[in-house]
Design a protein with these regions (language model features):
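N-terminal capping segments
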Residues: 1-80
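Ordered hydrophobic segments in well-structured contexts
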Residues: 108-110, 123-125, 177-178, 522, ...
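Extracytoplasmic/secreted proteins, especially bacterial periplasmic and envelope-associated proteins
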Residues: 49-56, 104, 125, 175
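Aromatic- and glycine-rich peptidoglycan recognition patches
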Residues: 118-190
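Preference for protein termini
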Residues: 187-593
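...with weaker cross-activation on analogous glycine-rich loops/strands in unrelated enzymes
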Residues: 76-143
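Amphipathic alpha-helical surface "interface" segments used
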Residues: 72-83, 285-291
Length: 593
């Protein structure tokens, strides 16, 4: 059998088919990032699996991709493709095996998990239709070179009876789900499957109380754990013996929802940045608009992490917002929850955040970051461990880095360039600060006072501001500037207008419309953070709850009221953390209030 990565032949369009003989690999080679297949900045999948080939075929021949999935059989539940040049979303229809709608060349062919395709299912590309058979191209099935000039891997029998088309596999223990075609025509197509609502229920459970969490159960010899303890003590929540479980189906639904919503947010971001009237709704200083658009054009694929806030229970799964410019929760999900499990958990479940730091390291390896990264954090004890967690990921990815606590160490050299206390040039930054903080500094300056963004290149007292770092053209900042668009709640009404009544969205508007009056609504400032300045209003116009904060003067949006569930007596918020969103979704942390 040819070793892993051997070229076996070509599919139509000159798309290469590679050997996926994992047994030929060094068993000690566990660098997951090395197995990620990219074309330019576009992630294709895990080398050299069937999903990677199918996505690469669509990308090279049609300029479209489907969203990332955990297993090949899950593709059959997707209902759109993304056009890579402009993030447009195109409809994708699924037709069951035995459908009156004939398969066609270029369509995806999907298998259920089981038999030869145990656990994973399978996907192939239909390359040719003949009278009583079809030809397909695929990866991870054949492991020998194709004959010269042959651009298909297998032929499958096609039976036409009573105007319906049925395909029969060459394996006798597999099930073909059907084929998927990019078309607006929904005749004979399947609706998107619903997950059983009971599968989304969050269950409460308790550990036996044996004093596992009395005293110093975190290891303060580890600098990262020590930083967490300095901020929070040896505390994970108010009751460390209480924990919560979700089903595997719910975990997969969260992954699917996060991937799908991320693409929807990108699609909406593209719409906003092409329309001045929409962009004006975000209250972003107009002097930044050209830079925003340039950031989107140049750095669309440079996002490392983000966080979506969901509500999940028997009613369904709804997204509240996308914290696309967020630096928090990595340590809690990727480390502290693991240490909690090691200390007291003896069940068969797993932490969905396990391996988070590996995913982050993989994202950094495929980023455009420069060899040395300055990690910029506020002078805040909680941000100490946020910064240290990311520094560990950068180190694992092979980057050198330095944490800057506050801005006091920075100054300008004689040429007006920014340098740190060691005299090192600052040209690549990962930050814990929100971009909104920098924009607040711009709002303090009259836009008519300067010809461009008011960035200092010197100061009598050497006082460096945040905008003097983040908005310097030569400084590469993660997360990119464009993430202020999906991270601003003004995008929520736009999302609703683009995808009305989508299963994961809540009705949201810039005014209280008739539907919101009937459902009740939440009043949220468009750039608010940490749950500040939110009002909850019932369908009887009764104020249910109200929070204070510093965002009271901001423009508001009005979002359909969708209250958090109570589980085991506590109000529960499930937070899905789509770290490394361009490659993988990872982590599910619980926040209990």
């Amino acid at each position: 059998m040819p070793p892993f990565g051997t070229l076996l032949g070509y599919a139509p369009g000159g798309v290469a088919i590679y050997s996926s003989d994992y047994n030929s690999l060094d068993p000690w080679d566990d660098d997951d990032a090395a197995f990620r297949s990219y074309i330019d900045d576009e992630y294709m999948g895990h080398k050299w699996q069937c999903v990677e080939f199918a996505r690469r075929f669509l990308f090279l021949n049609y300029g479209v991709v489907f969203t990332d999935v955990g297993m090949a059989w899950e593709i059959f539940s997707l209902r759109f493709l993304r056009e890579v040049v402009n993030d447009n979303i195109l409809p994708l229809q699924a037709f069951p095996n035995g459908s009156p709608r004939a398969p066609e060349a270029g369509a995806l062919l999907i298998w259920q998990k089981g038999g030869e395709f145990n656990e994973t299912g399978h996907v192939a590309i239909i390359t040719q239709l003949l009278d009583n058979k079809i030809r397909i191209a695929e990866q991870n099935v054949i492991h020998t070179p194709l004959p010269p000039g042959q651009q298909w891997t297998r032929e499958l029998e096609m039976v036409v009876e009573n105007g319906c088309y049925t395909l029969r596999d060459t394996f006798d223990d597999t099930t073909i789900l059907g084929w998927m075609i990019q078309t607006d025509d929904t005749q004979y197509s399947l609706s998107q499957p619903d997950i059983a609502n009971q599968s989304l229920a969050i269950r409460g459970a308790r550990l036996p109380e044996k004093g596992q969490f009395d005293g110093q159960w975190l290891d303060e010899r580890d600098p990262l754990q020590k930083a967490y303890v300095q901020a929070n003590g040896h505390v994970i929540n108010q009751d460390p013996y209480q924990y919560f479980t979700i089903t595997e189906s719910a975990e997969q639904e969260l992954i699917k929802a996060t991937n799908e919503l991320h693409l929807m947010y990108l699609h909406a971001t593209d719409k906003v940045l092409k329309d001045d009237n929409l962009l004006a709704l975000f209250d972003i200083p107009k002097i930044l608009w050209p830079r925003l658009r340039l950031s989107w054009q140049r750095r669309r694929h440079h996002m490392i992490t983000g966080r979506m806030d969901f509500c999940m229970d028997e009613r369904g799964l709804k997204v509240y917002e996308y914290n696309a410019d967020s630096a928090s929760c990595h340590t809690e999900a990727g480390l502290i929850l693991e240490k909690w499990a090691e200390q007291g958990y003896t069940g068969k479940g797993h932490n969905p955040a396990e391996g988070l730091i590996n995913e982050l390291a993989g994202a950094w390896k495929h980023s455009k970051a420069r060899p040395f990264v300055h990690i910029m954090q506020d002078d805040d004890i909680e941000e100490d461990y946020h910064a240290q967690f990311m520094q560990q990921a950068l180190h694992q990815a092979g980057f050198a880095s330095k944490i800057l606590r506050g801005l006091g160490e920075l100054r300008w050299d004689d040429a007006g360039q920014l340098i740190d206390g060691d005299g090192r040039l600052v040209n690549c930054v990962w930050k814990t600060w929100a971009w909104e903080t920098a924009m607040e500094q711009i709002r303090e300056v009259s836009e008519t006072e300067y010809a461009a963004v008011p960035i200092r290149t010197g100061h009598p007292e050497n006082e460096v501001r945040l905008i003097d770092v983040l908005l310097r053209p030569e400084v590469l900042v993660f997360e990119p500037l464009w993430t202020v668009i999906p991270g601003n709640k003004a995008i929520l009404p736009i999302l609703w207008s683009l995808f009305p009544h989508h299963r994961y969205l809540l009705d949201t508007d810039f005014t209280v419309n008739d539907e919101l009056v009937q459902t009740g609504y939440a009043v949220k400032p468009i750039a608010g953070r940490c749950g500040s300045n939110i009002d909850l209003v019932s369908h009887q116009e009764e104020l249910l709850d109200k929070t204070s904060g510093k965002f009271a003067t901001q423009k508001n949006i009005y979002q359909q009221l969708w209250c958090l569930p109570k589980v085991a007596g506590s109000i529960f918020r499930s937070v899905r953390l789509p770290w490394a969103v361009t490659t993988a979704v990872r982590a599910c942390a619980a926040m209990i209030h």
